[in-house]
Regions:
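Long, contiguous binding/interaction regions
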Residues: 1-124
C-alpha cells in the first residue's frame, strides 16, 4: 500500500504521513508489518496558487483480518495504490459482501453531504 501526502513544509508533510500511518495502525483487525518512508521531495508549482510544496510517500505492508477491513482502509485512508500479495484467491460470504457494500454506501452519503454545502465530520 502506498500513501502520498503534499504539504507546505517538509516537516508538515512528514508529520502528516506519520500521523496517518499511526492512526491506520490503531484500527482493529489491522497490523502494519512494514513501513518505509521515502525521501520527501520539493515540488515546484503543484497547484496554480502554490509556489512550492513537499511531497512525501510511505510504502506499507499491511495485514488485515479480512477483505472488509482492507476495503475500510482504502475508503478511510485513501492510499494511492494497493497490491494484494496474499491470498491468491479471495472469496467472501454474503455477510462480508454486505458489509463492504454498506461501507461504500456510507462513503457515497458523505459525498452527497459535501455536494450540498455541508460536511460530515467524525468528532472522535
Amino acid at each position: 500500500m502506498m500513501i502520498e501526502a503534499l504539504g507546505v513544509t517538509e516537516a508538515a508533510t512528514r508529520s502528516a504521513l506519520e500521523n496517518h500511518v499511526r492512526k491506520l495502525g490503531l484500527e482493529k483487525g489491522v497490523m502494519i508489518a512494514k513501513k518505509d518512508f521515502k525521501k520527501t521531495e520539493k515540488v515546484s508549482k503543484p497547484f496554480e496558487n502554490i509556489k512550492t510544496a513537499y511531497s512525501g510517500v510511505v510504502e506499507l505492508e499491511v495485514l488485515t483480518k479480512d477483505y472488509d477491513r482492507l476495503v475500510f482502509l482504502v475508503l478511510n485512508y485513501a492510499p494511492s495504490a494497493i497490491e494484494v500479495l496474499e491470498p491468491k484467491k479471495i472469496s467472501i460470504d454474503a455477510g462480508e459482501a454486505q458489509g463492504i457494500l454498506n461501507s461504500l454506501a456510507e462513503l457515497m452519503h458523505r459525498f452527497v453531504g459535501l455536494t450540498r454545502g455541508g460536511i460530515m465530520v467524525d468528532t472522535k
